Each structure stands twice: as structure tokens, then as C-alpha cells.
Amino acid sequence: MKMERKNVWQHRNREEIESFSKEYMDFMGRAKTERLAVREIRKFLEKEGFVPIEDFAGDPMDMAVYAVNRGKAIAAFRVVDDLKKGLNLVVAHIDSPRLDFKPNPLVEDEQIALFKTHYYGGIKKYHWFNIPLEIHGVLFRGDGEEIEIHVGDKPEDPVFTIPDLLPHLDKEDAKISEKFKGENLMLIAGTIPLSGEEKEAVKMNVLKILNEMYGISEEDFVSGEIEVVPAFPPREVGIDRSLIGAYGQDDRICAYTALRAFLEANPKKSIGVVFLDKEEIGSDGNTGAKARFYLRVLRQILKIQGGPEIQNSHSMRYWKKSAVISGDVCAAVNPPYKDVHDLHNAPRSGYGVALVKYTGARGKYSTNDAHAEFVARVRQVLNERNVIWQVATLGKVDQGGGGTYAKFFAERGADVYDMGPALLGMHSPFEISSKADLFETYRAYRALLEDL
């Protein structure tokens, strides 16, 4: 009668967990930005025979198609029946907290060249000082040519860093928000002056090096997107190697497990995965959830199937026949800080995929609150498939709050449930997940894609 927690390690084959974890870590080492994540996901899809939807020319009741939105979001669908009967969907976001170059980033101060940044998403600013950093992104030159920038991800590359103030001179008892200011998040770019230059000679030398490497000028930064991320690979954590430490596990751990579940599923009805951008800053913009680019893809599928192309997304009745799993992480109980949790409703590392009925803040503001009927369906499928799960909430009532994509998909009329692994150190440069929870999340997503 009593609900008891189960430790995944005591119920699963360790070799399976380790094999899956290694492949996941390889993916995470390559997918450190949303653009790079889309590139990796696309490789997985094309390897399994998926084609861009505009190139599809086969059986409309047997489709394996995908679509990319501006290189920052991607959706894929396996259609096995009339789409108007509905589909099962897992969604996740592939953006993560980071630093972005400002539009005019390069300055010189005290004979040190620096790149100015603006932080993206909810970070603790002090996390980003005194660690090795790498940069990735694109620039468009004045002639329109696209230039990819990648520095710091190879062993032979230099890295960047943001130096902090030494403790000997940092005796003031100031607030953290005052000690670590956003304007001080500047990367060291160089210290060697360009011979013959009298003014900003170090900055000029950095520009000279960039021009030699990429053929770019300072003005080209205006039409660029350069992202700053930690310059260390995913690592196993703990003497028993049971955990994974990596940047960007919120939320690329859900993206990877959803992708694997999607590609390996044997569905009875049409299924899909949607990986979107901008979740960490409110889901705005035309690559975020509010833009609903996936609906345009679904309309194309309906048109290919011979039905009327529905112009008004609100009239998509099939959406009400669909089930959506919002794949996102939650906060695992961290022993030194467990007082922020309601421990009776908090997830633990190693105890399976976490089911989150609602997020939001205060009085459940700005959330999707999954209906009991849908929760019952999900629970039944997970239990029938022997998936180990646990319940989760985002801390004590009024402790704080947060949100996911769930509410945006619920607005279309589908039932939606938040679900994913619990992390330690979420939104830090080195988030911690359990290998066991990683594997169990994959098993949960696959079960729900197949049987909901």
C-alpha cells in the first residue's frame, strides 16, 4: 500500500547503463550550443533515413521527416497513420545558460584585450570566473559569407577565462550580486601589442589574428552570434563513476534521451520529437516555443496526406488527440542545501525519471498543471513497462519557482506532462546527473512514445 522509492542501480543491468552513458557523453561533448546540437541531431536522423520534409516523396502513411528552423531548432516525425488521429510527442530545449558576445565586444583596458559579454539565462555569475572557456558561433562578413568560429574545443587550442579579484584585496563584505557584476564578465583575449601601433595596440593585434584565422574585421561582430561555454569535456563523477558531470545537461540530457527513444521506438501511432531554442529566456523569438514552428511542419504533413491544409492552428482538432511529454530536468536533493526542498515531494539522484505535475511559482502561477486523468495514463504505461519513476516538485512552496515548455503545448489542446532526470548543480557550468536516471529517462520516453 505504501509508495516506496526504488534505486535504479539495484534493478538494471549496469553494462546497459554504462554503454548508454558513454554514447551520451560523446554527444554532450560535441553539442555545446543549440546550433551544434541541431547539427548532431540532424546527423542521427539522417543516419536512420529521415529526410527534410520538403524532399519527401514516399508513402504519406509511412513518413520519416524532419525540419530545421534557422539552425537553432529541429523537429522530426515518424508518421505511421492518418495524422488527424493524433500523435505522441516528446519536446525538449537545446539552449542552455551561457555567455554571449556583445555586438561590439572587443575592447582594450590596461594593455589587456577583452571580449565583453552578456549572460544568457539564469546563471550565478560567480560560477563563470576563473574557469577555462571556449567560444562557438557564426559571423557574417560584409559580403554575406558565413564564417564559423570555434576556439578552445580542441586540445591544441587556447582557451579563454574571466579572472576574479584575489582574496588578498577582496576584503569588503559585499553582496554576491555586488561582487560579481554582469559588466565584469569579460574574457581575456590577449596581451601582445601589434608592432607599430600606438593606440589600442593589443586590441589591434587580436583583430589581426582573427583576420588571419577567419578573414573577418571588427565590424563583422555586429552580424555575429558568438557563445561562450565551459572548455571542459563531460566527465564521470564519483569513485564509483555513477554520475556524469557536464555543461548543458539542462536540457540536452532530455533532448538526447528523447532522440534515442524516438529513433528506437516501435510506435502504434505517429510520433515526434521537437527540440527548441530560447527556453532559458522565456521561449520568445522565432526559434522558441511561442513561435510554434512545429505546427507548420505538421500542416505540411497533413497536406502531403491529402487532407486540407489547416491555416488556423486553433482548428487543429487532432492536437486534442495528442499526448505531449515535456522533457525537462528538475532539482535533485543536494544534501548541504536540502532545506529548500519539501523532502516528501523531492527527487533523488539514482531513483529514476522524475514526474513533475506542475512547475510555476507561488500559487502555481504560469504553469501547466497536468490533469489527473493524463497522469493516470502515464503512470499506467510506466508501471506496465517497469520504468522506475519518482515524483518531483520545484522546492518548497514559495521558495522560488521556474517553468518549462509544457504550458505552450497545452495551449494547443494536448495533454502535457513534465518529465525528466533530476540534476545537482543545475544551471552551473558543470551540472551533475545520474547515469541511472539518464537511462531510465530514455526508457520512460520510449515507453510513452510507443504506448500512450
From Swiss-Prot:
Swiss-Prot/TrEMBL GO biological process terms: proteolysis
The protein's name in its UniProt record: Probable M18 family aminopeptidase 1
Cofactor: Zn(2+)
Family label: Belongs to the peptidase M18 family.
Enzyme Commission number, as recorded: 3.4.11.-
UniProt keyword Iron present: no
InterPro entries documented for this protein: M18_aminopeptidase_1 (IPR022983), Peptidase_M18 (IPR001948), Peptidase_M18_dom2 (IPR023358)
First-level EC class: hydrolase
HAMAP family: Aminopeptidase_M18_1 (MF_00466)
Binding of Zn(2+), residues: 93, 168, 427
Recorded GO MF terms: aminopeptidase activity; metallopeptidase activity; zinc ion binding
Entry-linked NCBIfam families: PRK02256.1
UniProt entry tagged with the keyword Hydrolase: yes
One CC-aspect GO term: cytoplasm
Gene: apeA
Keyword set, alphabetical order: Aminopeptidase, Hydrolase, Metal-binding, Metalloprotease, Protease, Zinc
Pfam families on file: Peptidase_M18
